[in-house]
Amino acid sequence: MCAGVAMPFGCLTFGEKKDYNNPSEVTDKYDLGQIVKSEEFCEIFRAKDKNTLKMYTCKKFLKKDGRKVRKAAKNEILILKMVKHPNILQLVDVYETRKEYYLFLELATGREVFDWILDQGYYSERDTSNVIRQVMEAVAYLHSLRIVHRNLKVPDAGLSQVVGSGVALHAPAFGMLLFLENLVYYNRLKNSKIVISDFHLAKLENGLIKEPCGTPEYLEVVGRQRYGRPVDCWALGVIMYILLSGNPPFYDETDDDDYENHDKNLFRKILAGDYEFDSPYWDDISDSAKSLVSRLMEVDQHQRLTAQEAINHEWYSDVDS
C-alpha cells in the first residue's frame, strides 16, 4: 500500500524513498497472458482486468536487464503521464516492484487493417493522408509539450533488404510494410483512428538533444551533434514516402556483405537528402504530395516544415477534393 499522497498510477514514485508494489498486487488485479512479443527493453503481454474483464497491453521491464532498461521504463512512464491525445495510446496503470516495472496501456487491435489495405495492391493518397494527418496532429501535440518522440518508423522487416540490395521492389509484391511499427490502428473498424505507441525513446526537449537514437533512415541526425523536434517531421516524411511508393527513399547498391561501405554510403545520402521520386512508383502521385514529402525531408532543419505547418499543407485539401 502506498503511503502519503495517492498516485494516479500504481505506487510509482521518483523520490528518495520508494514504496514498492508487491508482485501480488499486479496479479491480484490482472491476468497476464503469454508473452506476445519481446522487444529490446521489455516483454509485452495481453492482460485482462479481473474485475472489468477489459483487455490491456502490459509492458514488463526487468530491472536486472540493466541501466538502459530502467531508464527506458522511467522515461516511458514520465512521458505517458504527461500526454492525453486521441491519437496516442494511453497509459492506464503502473506498478513498480523491486524487480520490475509494469505498464498497462490501452490495447490496440487494428493492425490487420493495414493487411487489408495492402492486399488491394497499393496505398492510395487518400489512405496515406488519413494516416499522416492523424499522426501529424499527435506529433504537433507532443511538440507543443516539447516532447520529441525520436522513434517514429515502419518495421525493419523487408526494408533492410531493399535498402541493402538497392533493388526497388514495390511493397505489396515484396510483402513488407504489413503494419507501421509504432503507428497502429486502434481497432478493426473501417474508420478506426491511428495511435502512436512506444515512448521509451521519447525525450523532453530541454535545449537541443545530443545523443542519437532510433533508426538512421528516419533520423537525419547521423552526422549532427544536436537535434530537436524537427527530427520527428523528417521521420514522417520518410514514412509518407514509403506509404505512397512502397519503397524507402534511401538505399545503397553496395554488396550486402560490405557493411562498412554500405553504411557510409547510406548515411551520406541521408545527410545530403539524396533521394528521388522514382518511376513508375511516383508517376501517378500528385505534385502536392511530393511537395509535402520534400518539405518534411528538407535537410536544413530551419527550413523544414513543423508538424503544425504540415497539418495545413495543401495536399490534404487536394486529396479530399
Segment roles from a protein language model:
Residues 298-321:
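Terminal C-lobe "cap" of eukaryotic-type protein kinase domains
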Residues 131-132:
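Activation segment signature within eukaryotic-like protein kinase domains
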Residues 43-63:
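Glycine-rich ATP phosphate-binding loop
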Residues 33-40, 44:
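Protein kinase glycine-rich loop
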Residues 99-112, 116:
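Conserved short submotifs of the Hanks-type protein kinase catalytic core
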Residues 93-94:
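A short, aromatic-enriched beta-strand patch in the conserved N-lobe beta-sheet
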Residues 221-230:
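Conserved end of the kinase activation segment
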